[in-house]
């Protein structure tokens, strides 16, 4: 039993292991990063099922709300971010980098203080069930950027070899434990934005020199010392020219994360110090010496020596001949020869080398006339910069050394030519003859081209008869055209078959002989100038035609005339005729007559070879095209290629080519005489009848060219367009238009040719829908030789209007005379009746009119688009009651007409409400009968009739007070305005009286007060007098 339990436990463990448990891991915190700098947080998921690429969601819990989730960014949902982070996510300041399907990095490019908090990485469940962890958290603390690096901005001028000391001050106030690293850089002038590292102190306090300063650091010439806690000093014992540039230091602050990795959190650079270094003086002198006397044919070695410079200077030398640079050797021994001397060095004729650090050599193995002149050398001291290039410190020039050959007495030589001026492609023959006694001679021919100053070896023959051709000849094919032969012991002939323009120049024949008992032989030279004229320089091609405008089906001629000054050479040539169709931008080949007689046709005009004749004579080609077609309108030109005389046998390429001027050929139609009857007519028919419409041709072009007849129709409805009924083309094939393709339309309309000048359109069983305008279009066609039709002219006939004649019986309207009176503002009524009950298959419409002195007649549309109701001249349509009960009013009808109705199928009533004086006049009605015809049924106007005129008189009503007032505008205005004016005057009067009464009241009160005072005084006086009197008694 225990064994079974163990097995079960093991099975469950394996099952759990195979299924796996999801686990999300995030970079361990807390993490400390500085404000303004980036941060990257890693998150991975393992043990998951589902797709290999998992989605990640990042959120933050801020210290101010530690339980509130703020969504930042997601790999799945673009709208996951909260508004506070959405803008930074959209601007890519915050983004997710996927390392693998199950691993990502959250990047924040520029941290803000508000970014501090607890970050959560969450992975949505893709497993069959929830098992494991789906999120992980870490803390991020954003600390202020307190790092600073300072160094005064200054410009220092130093001499080479002097010491240099620069100090960089750094401070930081980060609360957490951090390390500093510091690096000194040099930014050289012209080095772009790339700085060179001098020396650095790592965060682990390890000194490391830059690659360019490793040797000097090991030697102790470059040092980095830490002075106290914040100062770092760069010391250079002996400055070198390569140290010139901008010097600065960079401080970097590092912090160790919980996973024990060091991460950069801040970095600062100081201002730059401009360092100018004056190279030390290194004076030396340069001299030039020769190893032997400069005899012709002998070797010559020139040595350039720099003297007076101690140490191991880096020197480069430059050789000059007559002030022109010929060779240069740099400090590393790399040789650079100019083009003329590069060829001689490759042939082993000279050698330039650097014998030692201060010695340069120029060796010429066989001195010739071209080596005569003044030689000098220039030595420059250089130093390699940090970028690897050479910097020149100083230059010194040697005195000139004159090289002049001592020529031995030589025999005379004469050079002649059969023709000193030949055409390109002709044979150039030169003879070189030496005078004197018979001797074994060798000869070499040299050519100095017209645009060069250095001779080029053409051919040579040794004393044993061995011929050597120049290696500088332009290609093996051209070398085969050169031949050098010996006519006799003293005469040598150079023959250049099929000469080229590049063969022009000055030819020099050098005759050499070896003297007995002498190491060097004698050489005699002579020159001759030869010109090879270009064939293209005088080649002219003209294209001419007497008929730039050609009538259709006529013949035109083109002549390609070649003009050249070498026509007597009778060189073979080919002619290519080209054609650019009208409206095209490219030329196409019509025909090419090769110089060997081969004819090649183009494919632009398929029938051109059937009607073209080409004749060619010496320097002239003629093209004759019969039966011109319209597609042959365009621009023509011819191209001429001139070949060598023997090119037929050798199949060589053309020497030159030239293209003629452009010539426009226009193929025009012959003048057409087509004329068609353009008069218009009207046909009035009964419904279901048949008719014919004529298309008469008055005149035609000569030859009775084929015609095509096209019939068109336009209905009477507004804005109706013309529709094609049928077309009988120039081959008498009839085609119906798109709207007339039905079998019924093809039976109803058909064309008939009565004669050469008369065509008919037959219309059977005319219906209401057939009403409208008909005309024909006549096209005259011309058949070209390539079996294509060309339209010559198109004419259009006049219009034929087709109307339906009313077919019903006459409508009899009651003719009873009626004269009536109506009171103004009262009502009036009119009646209109038919005599009889009318047809049961008919419906009736009525139109009411009123006669008026000079009123303009108006028209109103009725039942359908093909019928109109027109008011008689001098009358006005008031209202129209259609057969289907719809009402249409005239211009004034809708203003007062209130009621128009049908009292019975054949009785009609018109009532006027609130009659006015201007309504007096003559009234009458017109009744129209309508019947339904065809399938589907359409209502057709059958007949109409008018009633007797009815006279209406309008009597004025007796005036009342209110009517008088309302009828008089001034009185009405007076009655409205006058009360307001009276009220205003009354109010003004009351106000004045009130103010006056108040003033009088005040005056009265004052008078009373004065009177009372006077009365009191009077009483006192009287009492006093009475007392006195009583005293007397």
UniProtKB/Swiss-Prot annotation:
Give residue spans on the Cytoplasmic membrane side: 992-1033
The record's section on PROSITE patterns has: IG_LIKE (PS50835)
- Cellular component GO terms held in the UniProt record: membrane
Q: Name one Pfam family in it.
A: ig
Give the sugar-modified residues. 139, 677
For this chain, the Swiss-Prot or TrEMBL PTM comment says: N-glycosylated.
Is tRNA-binding among this UniProt entry's keywords?
A: no
Q: How does it sit in the membrane?
A: Single-pass type I membrane protein
Note the SS bond partners: 43-121, 168-249, 304-377, 432-509, 560-638, 695-776, 832-925
Which UniProt key words apply to this protein?
Disulfide bond, Glycoprotein, Immunoglobulin domain, Membrane, Repeat, Signal, Transmembrane, Transmembrane helix
Q: What is the effect of changing residue 175 to A?
A: In strain: NOD/MrkTac
The secretion signal range is 1-20
| Residue runs in coiled coils | none
Q: Name one GO biological process term.
A: positive regulation of myeloid leukocyte differentiation
Ranges per topology, Extracellular? 21-970
Q: What is its main location?
A: membrane
Q: Where in the cell is it found?
A: Membrane
Motif EWI motif located where? 253-255
* PANTHER family linked: IMMUNOGLOBULIN SUPERFAMILY MEMBER 2, V-SET AND TRANSMEMBRANE DOMAIN-CONTAINING PROTEIN
What is the annotated role of this protein in its UniProt record? Plays a role as inhibitor of T-cells proliferation induced by CD3. Inhibits expression of IL2RA on activated T-cells and secretion of IL2. Inhibits tyrosine kinases that are required for IL2 production and cellular proliferation. Inhibits phospholipase C-gamma-1/PLCG1 phosphorylation and subsequent CD3-induced changes in intracellular free calcium. Prevents nuclear translocation of nuclear factor of activated T-cell to the nucleus. Plays a role in the inhibition of T-cell proliferation via IL10 secretion by cutaneous dendritic cells.
- Protein name as annotated: Immunoglobulin superfamily member 2
């Amino acid at each position: 039993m225990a064994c079974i339990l163990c097995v079960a436990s093991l099975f469950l463990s394996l099952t759990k292991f195979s299924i796996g448990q999801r686990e999300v891991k995030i970079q361990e915190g807390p993490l400390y990063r500085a404000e303004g700098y980036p941060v990257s947080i890693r998150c991975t998921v393992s043990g998951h099922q589902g797709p290999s690429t998992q989605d990640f969601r990042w959120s933050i819990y801020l210290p101010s709300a530690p339980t509130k989730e703020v969504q930042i960014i997601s790999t799945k949902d673009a709208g996951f971010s909260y508004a506070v982070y959405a803008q930074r996510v959209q601007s890519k300041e915050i983004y997710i980098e996927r390392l693998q399907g199950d691993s990502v990095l959250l990047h924040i490019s520029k941290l803000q203080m508000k970014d501090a908090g607890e970050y959560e990485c969450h992975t949505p469940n893709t497993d069959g069930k929830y098992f494991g962890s789906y999120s992980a958290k870490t803390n991020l603390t954003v600390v202020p950027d307190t790092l600073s690096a300072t160094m005064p901005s200054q410009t220092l001028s130093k001499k080479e070899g002097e010491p240099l000391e620069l100090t960089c001050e750094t401070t930081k106030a980060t609360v957490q434990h951090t390390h500093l690293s510091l690096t000194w850089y040099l930014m050289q002038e012209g080095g772009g934005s790339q700085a060179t590292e001098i020396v650095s102190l790592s965060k682990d306090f390890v000194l490391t020199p830059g690659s360019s300063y490793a040797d000097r650091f090991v030697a102790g010439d470059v040092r980095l010392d830490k002075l106290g806690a914040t100062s770092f000093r760069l010391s250079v014992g002996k400055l070198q020219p390569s140290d010139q540039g901008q010097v600065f230091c960079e401080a970097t602050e590092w912090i160790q994360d919980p996973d024990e990795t060091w991460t950069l959190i801040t970095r600062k650079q100081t201002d730059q110090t401009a360092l100018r270094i004056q190279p030390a003086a290194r004076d030396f002198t340069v001299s030039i010496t020769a190893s032997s006397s400069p005899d012709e044919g002998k070797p010559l070695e020139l040595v350039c020596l720099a003297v007076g410079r101690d140490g191991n200077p880096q020197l480069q030398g430059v050789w000059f001949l007559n002030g022109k640079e010929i060779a240069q050797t740099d400090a590393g021994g790399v040789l650079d020869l100019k083009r003329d001397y590069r060829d001689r060095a490759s042939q082993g004729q000279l050698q330039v080398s650097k014998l030692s650090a201060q010695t340069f050599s120029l060796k010429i193995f066989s001195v010739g006339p071209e080596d005569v002149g003044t030689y000098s050398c220039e030595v420059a001291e250089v130093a390699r910069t940090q970028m690897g290039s050479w910097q020149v410190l100083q230059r010194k020039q040697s005195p000139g050394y004159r090289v002049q050959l001592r020529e031995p007495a030589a025999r005379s030589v004469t050079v002649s030519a059969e023709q000193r001026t030949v055409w390109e492609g002709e044979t150039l023959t030169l003879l070189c003859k030496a005078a004197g006694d018979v001797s074994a001679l060798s000869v070499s021919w040299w050519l100095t081209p017209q645009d060069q100053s250095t001779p080029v070896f053409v051919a040579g023959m040794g004393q044993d008869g061995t011929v050597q051709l120049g290696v500088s000849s332009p290609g093996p094919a051209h070398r085969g055209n050169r031949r050098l032969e010996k006519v006799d012991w003293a005469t040598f002939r150079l023959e250049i078959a099929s000469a080229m323009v590049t063969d022009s120049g000055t030819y020099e024949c050098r005759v050499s002989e070896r003297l007995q008992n002498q190491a060097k032989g004698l050489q005699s030279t002579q020159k001759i100038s030869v010109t090879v004229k270009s064939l293209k320089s005088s080649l002219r091609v003209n294209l001419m035609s007497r008929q730039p405008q050609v009538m259709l089906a006529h013949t035109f001629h083109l002549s390609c005339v070649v003009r050249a000054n070498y026509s007597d050479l009778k060189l073979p040539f080919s002619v290519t005729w080209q054609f650019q169709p009208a409206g095209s931008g490219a030329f196409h080949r019509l025909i090419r007559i090769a110089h060997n007689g081969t004819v090649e046709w183009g494919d632009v005009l398929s029938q051109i070879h059937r009607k073209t004749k080409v004749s060619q004579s010496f320097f002239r080609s003629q093209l004759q095209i019969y039966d011109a077609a319209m597609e042959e309108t365009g621009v023509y030109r011819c191209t001429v290629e001139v070949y060598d005389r023997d090119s037929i046998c050798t199949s060589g390429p053309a020497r030159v080519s030239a293209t003629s001027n452009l010539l426009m050929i226009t193929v025009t139609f012959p003048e057409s005489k087509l004329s068609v009857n353009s008069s218009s007519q009207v046909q009035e028919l009964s419904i279901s009848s048949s008719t014919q419409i004529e298309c008469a041709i008055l005149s035609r072009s000569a030859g009775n060219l084929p015609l095509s007849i096209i019939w068109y129709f336009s209905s009477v409805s507004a804005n109706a367009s013309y529709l094609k009924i049928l077309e009988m083309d120039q081959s008498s094939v009839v085609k119906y238009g798109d709207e007339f393709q039905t079998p019924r339309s093809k039976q109803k309309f058909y064309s008939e040719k009565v004669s050469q000048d008369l065509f008919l359109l037959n219309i059977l069983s005319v219906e209401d829908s057939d009403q409208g305008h008909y005309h024909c279009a006549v096209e005259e066609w011309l058949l070209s030789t390539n079996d294509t039709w060309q339209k010559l002219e198109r004419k259009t006939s006049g219009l034929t209007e087709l109307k339906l004649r009313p077919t019903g019986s006459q409508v009899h309207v009651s003719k009873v005379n009626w004269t009536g009176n109506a009171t103004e503002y009262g009502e009036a009524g009119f009646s209109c009746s038919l005599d009889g009950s009318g047809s049961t298959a008919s419906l009736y419409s009525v139109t009411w009119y009123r006669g008026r002195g000079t009123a303009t007649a108006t028209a109103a549309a009725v039942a359908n688009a093909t019928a109109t109701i027109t008011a008689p001249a001098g009358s006005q349509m008031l209202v129209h009651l259609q057969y289907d009960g719809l009402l249409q009013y005239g211009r004034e009808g809708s203003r007062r007409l209130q009621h128009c109705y049908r009292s019975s199928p054949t009785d009609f009533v018109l009532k006027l409400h609130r009659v006015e004086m201007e309504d007096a006049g003559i009234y009458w009605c017109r009744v129209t009968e309508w019947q339904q015809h065809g399938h589907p049924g359409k209502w057709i106007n059958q007949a109409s009739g008018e009633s007797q005129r009815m006279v209406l008189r309008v009597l004025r009503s007796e005036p009342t007070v209110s009517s008088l007032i309302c009828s008089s505008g001034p009185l009405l205005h007076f009655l409205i305005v006058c009360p307001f004016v009276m009220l205003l005057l009354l109010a003004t009067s009351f106000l004045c009286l009130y103010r006056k009464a108040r003033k009088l009241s005040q005056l009265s009160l004052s008078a009373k007060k004065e009177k009372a005072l006077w009365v009191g005084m009077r009483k006192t006086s009287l009492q006093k007098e009475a007392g006195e009197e009583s005293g007397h008694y």
